[in-house]
């Protein structure tokens, strides 16, 4: 039940701000930018696995 509520919350535009109209071409880039720190976090595990978690 709470998942449905959270899902509806994240789908509305009240949580995420809208970019001004002149920045509209950058909208797809803005959607991807928050994922970059997660990729660095996963890269740390891949790096440690490659050196056998020394």
Curated annotation (Swiss-Prot):
The chain crosses the membrane at residues 29-49. It comes from the Eukaryota. Pfam families: PsbK. SUPFAM superfamilies: Photosystem II reaction center protein K, PsbK. One of its GO terms (cellular component) is chloroplast thylakoid membrane. It is found in: Plastid, Chloroplast thylakoid membrane. Residues 1-17 form a propeptide. Keywords: Chloroplast, Membrane, Photosynthesis, Photosystem II, Plastid, Reaction center, Thylakoid, Transmembrane, Transmembrane helix. One of its GO terms (biological process) is photosynthesis. It is a single-pass membrane protein. InterPro entries: PSII_PsbK (IPR003687), PSII_PsbK_sf (IPR037270). Belongs to the PsbK family. One of the components of the core complex of photosystem II (PSII). PSII is a light-driven water:plastoquinone oxidoreductase that uses light energy to abstract electrons from H(2)O, generating O(2) and a proton gradient subsequently used for ATP formation. It consists of a core antenna complex that captures photons, and an electron transfer chain that converts photonic excitation into a charge separation. PSII is composed of 1 copy each of membrane proteins PsbA, PsbB, PsbC, PsbD, PsbE, PsbF, PsbH, PsbI, PsbJ, PsbK, PsbL, PsbM, PsbT, PsbY, PsbZ, Psb30/Ycf12, at least 3 peripheral proteins of the oxygen-evolving complex and a large number of cofactors. It forms dimeric complexes. This is Photosystem II reaction center protein K. It comes from Euglena gracilis.
């Amino acid at each position: 039940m709470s998942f449905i509520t959270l899902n509806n919350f994240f789908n509305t535009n009240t949580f995420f701000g809208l970019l001004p109209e002149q920045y509209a071409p950058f909208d797809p880039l803005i959607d991807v930018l928050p994922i970059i720190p997660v990729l660095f976090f996963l890269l740390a595990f891949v790096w440690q696995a490659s050196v056998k978690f020394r």
